[in-house]
Amino acid sequence: MGDKNDKEDNLSLPKATVSKLIKEMLPQDVKCSNETRDLILECCVEFIHLISSEANDICGREQKRTIAAEHVIKALTELGFSDYTQKVSDVYDKHKLEVSTKSKSSKKFENLGKPTEQLIREQQLLFAKARSAFQASPEAQQLQQLQQQQQQQQGGLQAPSVQQQTDINTTTTSTIQK
């Protein structure tokens, strides 16, 4: 449907982010017009296209299928932006460190040294205890009484009493513990 130029026209950077960066870089007494902001935005997009195109070429020459950070750093050097390579490398190293730290913390609970079956039994025991505690609460007893009254009014079967339910839960809990 659309050609390559249509896709490129839709590619841009968030204006709010670019505006924020411009504001941070300029002295407080200097303002930036919308036209200037748009021009800077276009320049940034063009710069990204230039770097990514060169990184893609480097990637192709190395017969790789995925553009890596190293390709981007080489592209900066080959295009005459070697002044930026150290900063880019530093930011990339920091990013790798953050990702590895985040990955380690997400796996923190992965292997607690207990088999899955034991963890499931412990979870079921906790559920049974919570259920017993709730059923022993005054709110649960009131709810139970209301349900019994409704069933009696409807002529249905009588629900087990709170004591009967507690006995059932105690039996269930002791069975799970075994």
From Swiss-Prot:
InterPro entries according to UniProt: CBFA_NFYB_domain, Histone-fold, Ncb2
CC annotations in GO: negative cofactor 2 complex
UniProt record, GO biological process: negative regulation of transcription by RNA polymerase II; RNA polymerase II preinitiation complex assembly
Pfam families: CBFD_NFYB_HMF
Protein's UniProt keywords contain Signal: no
Subcellular location: Nucleus
Signal peptide as annotated in the record: none
Superkingdom assignment: Eukaryota
An example Gene Ontology molecular-function term: protein heterodimerization activity
Positions of region (Disordered): 139-178
Self-association and partners: Heterodimer with drap1 to form the negative cofactor 2 (NC2) complex.
Family statement drawn from the similarity comment of this UniProt entry: Belongs to the NC2 beta/DR1 family.
Identification of the protein by name: Protein Dr1 homolog
Organism the protein comes from: Dictyostelium discoideum
Gene from which this protein is expressed: dr1
